[in-house]
Regions:
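N-terminal signal peptide c-region/cleavage motif recognized by signal peptidases
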Residues: 16-18
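Bacterial N-terminal signal peptides that target proteins for export
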Residues: 1-8
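Short, small/polar residue-rich loop motifs at catalytic or cofactor-binding pockets
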Residues: 300, 417-420, 481-483
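Noncatalytic scaffold domains of N-terminal-nucleophile
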Residues: 23-73, 77, 85-263, 268-270, ...
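Short beta-strand scaffold segments in enzyme catalytic cores
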Residues: 104, 109-116, 421-425, 485-487, ...
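Internal maturation/activation junctions in enzymes
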Residues: 42, 337-439, 451-452, 459, ...
Length: 615
């Protein structure tokens, strides 16, 4: 890897040699003297689709798309210095541990779909966490937690935060696994940008400051009634959450990244970091052991797949929820012509409330199956082949009233938000990566490992305490997981990554995004930015982004939907890219710059701070 000047060192040199003027204070719109000004002077874009916030980024040699600019630049730095798309994905994810720690950390889960150009195949990694040895339904019952038969979906009876829903983290194992199998560089190289920024700090943006909310983590008489002192020490600046424009540093995380650079994943799962995790867990009444960490292994699995308008849609399989996007698309493909007497989503169009009604009803049907069956396939048989068959989709058409909203089931407990990052990368060899990494909730469990600068996630909150459920908590089992990432192939060739973060929004968001692109013909940036809905099975509410609410909200309410207008915070964030074959580029390479015969296009959701960067 070529030697480059540290961005931190460069900034320090500039500050040392120049005096700068002090600008006006950075503040949010709501804190200005005239908040109404903000919505009154919104500009109007005239190029491309009306919905899109900017043009697509396009380039031949390599691309990184994610939710935070410094993280995207970290991945691009790796690409430009000899790394491939897999190396760039790990570097980007590590930097997001620094810049979006409420969303993602090495104490959480990881899934990835990797298209390996040399093998002409999509490989799927499940590096999600397993319940520790002592995690049983009986133990939780004795602690006062019980299954609620009136609300029996994922999460029923489980505590939402604190140490009890912490599962063994899989992210670091996954980082090392993808590097060893597909990467060109080492931990030492790909973790360097993140280590530098963790030590030197970075300024907090408005969106990051808004999301920076520590949850209660420590129990008094019940779960989670006070903040973890180690979390306050690590994530607050001068005793308070950081404000926009404030510099945030995490030297403890820098130390952890340096340990990984020198000792690899063993430092996390078998060394001093493992000892610190277990000590913290046991101090709070958790059951994780050193053996749980040392024995952790992720899995290489086969994707769930279906065909939609001739495109192969690959999604994460159980215990991830992503496969429900495939079921939604199957239902739409089979049933829309039945429901609309030969019509299509494209012929209806998004100004017609039936277009949205059909999407929503398809989502309800697929999520009913998702909540009923989704679980760790190593412990329970998930009938995925049946659920994703054309015949099964066709059998569901009669369950929907084309003119009136249905009552969905079964119930489940999900918050509106989901604190997750997604990213997409591609390189000049044709490798492409679709990646999702998460803490689950904002700052996960709220429990920080002292001295190491990372939070423990709370994904175990999506187990259930129903002893008869396939998703009931038990040792070494993976819980139901909202994380979703996908990949699209066409004619057995790689086409597009599919990523959208946002808790229970993810599978339904994937389906909406793919409909935008393949039915309506939206470009990637327009598809990322277009208004979306979010439906909750319980309490059967339909959230519509305000422009969509203004367009069809009243008509959907008249059809029986319980509708509310919301902003984009509930709608997740899309980060996608697509390969476009172009034979004219086959001879364009040189000895120093090579690339596949084509280029990449991208879409980065304006609801986040992110961007697509490329060269």
């Amino acid at each position: 890897m070529q030697k480059s000047i540290s961005p931190i060192a460069l900034m320090s040199a500039l500050v040392a040699s120049h005096a700068f003027a002090q600008g006006p204070k950075l503040q949010t719109c709501e804190s200005t003297p005239q908040p109404a000004f903000c919505s009154a002077v919104r500009g109007v874009r005239t190029e491309g689709w009306p919905a899109q916030s900017r043009s697509e980024v396009m380039a031949q040699h390599g691309m990184v798309v994610t939710s935070q600019p410094l993280a995207a630049q970290a991945g691009l730095q790796i690409l430009r210095h000899g790394g491939n798309a897999i190396d760039a994905a790990v570097a980007t994810a590590a930097m997001l541990n620094v810049t979006e720690p409420m969303m993602v950390g090495m104490g959480g889960d990881l899934f990835a779909l990797v298209y390996a150009a040399k093998e002409h195949k999509v490989f799927v990694l499940n590096a999600s966490g397993m319940a520790p040895t002592g995690a049983t339904v009986d133990r939780f019952n004795k602690l006062g937690y019980a299954w609620n038969p009136k609300n029996w979906g994922p999460g029923s009876g489980m505590p939402a935060g604190g140490i009890l829903p912490v599962t063994v983290p899989g992210a670091v194992w996954g980082w090392q696994a993808v590097l060893k199998r597909f990467g060109k560089l080492t931990f030492k190289e790909v973790l360097e940008p993140a280590a530098q920024y963790a030590q030197g700090g970075f300024p907090i943006s408005e969106r990051i400051a808004h999301d920076w909310r520590l949850p209660n983590a420590l129990p008094l008489q019940a779960c989670c009634t006070s903040l973890d002192p180690d979390s306050i020490k690590t994530w607050y600046v001068n005793g308070a959450q950081p404000r926009p424009g404030q510099i945030f540093r995490n030297p403890d995380l820098a130390r952890t990244l340096r340990l990984l650079q020198s000792k690899g994943a063993d430092a996390f799962y078998k060394g001093e970091i493992a000892q610190a995790i277990v000590a913290k867990s046991q101090a709070l009444g958790g059951s994780m052991t050193l053996e749980d960490l040392a024995g952790y292994k992720g899995e290489w699995v086969e994707p769930a797949r279906t065909q939609y308008h001739g495109y192969d849609i690959l999604e994460l399989p159980p215990p991830a929820q992503a496969w429900a996007a495939d079921e939604i698309l199957n239902i739409l493909q089979a049933c829309v012509p039945v429901w609309s007497t030969g019509g299509t989503l494209a012929s209806l169009g998004p100004a017609n409330p039936l277009y949205w009604h059909f999407l929503i009803e398809a989502k309800k049907l697929a999520y009913a199956d998702l909540y009923r069956y989704n679980a760790d396939p190593n412990f329970a048989a998930v009938p995925l082949a049946k659920l994703l068959s054309e015949a099964y989709a066709a059998s569901l058409c009669g369950k929907v009233d084309p003119q009136h909203a249905s009552i969905p089931g079964p119930p489940a407990n999900f918050s509106n938000s989901g604190d997750t990052i997604v990213l997409s990368t591609a390189d000049d060899e044709g490798n492409m990566v679709s990646w999702v990494n998460s803490n689950f909730s904002a700052f996960g469990s709220g429990v920080t490992v002292p001295g190491y600068g990372f939070i423990l996630h709370n994904r175990g909150a999506l187990f259930t305490l129903d002893p008869k459920s396939p998703n009931a908590i038990e040792p070494h089992k993976r819980p139901y997981n909202t994380l979703s990432a996908g990949f699209v192939m066409h004619d057995d060739r790689p086409l597009m990554t599919v990523t959208l973060m946002g808790g229970d929004m993810q599978a339904q968001g994937h389906a909406q995004l793919l409909v935008d692109i393949f039915d309506l013909g939206a470009n990637l940036q327009a598809g990322a930015d277009m208004a979306r809905f979010r439906h909750a099975q319980v309490p059967n509410t339909l959230s519509l982004e305000t422009p969509l609410y203004d367009l069809v909200g009243a008509k959907l309410a008249a059809m029986g939907h319980t509708v509310k207008s919301v902003n984009g915070e509930e709608m997740g964030g899309v980060q996608i890219l697509m390969f476009v074959a172009d034979p004219s580029l086959a001879q364009a390479g040189t000895d120093t710059i090579k690339h596949v015969a084509g280029y990449y296009r991208s879409g980065s959701d304006f609801r986040k701070d992110g961007e697509a960067v490329a060269w």
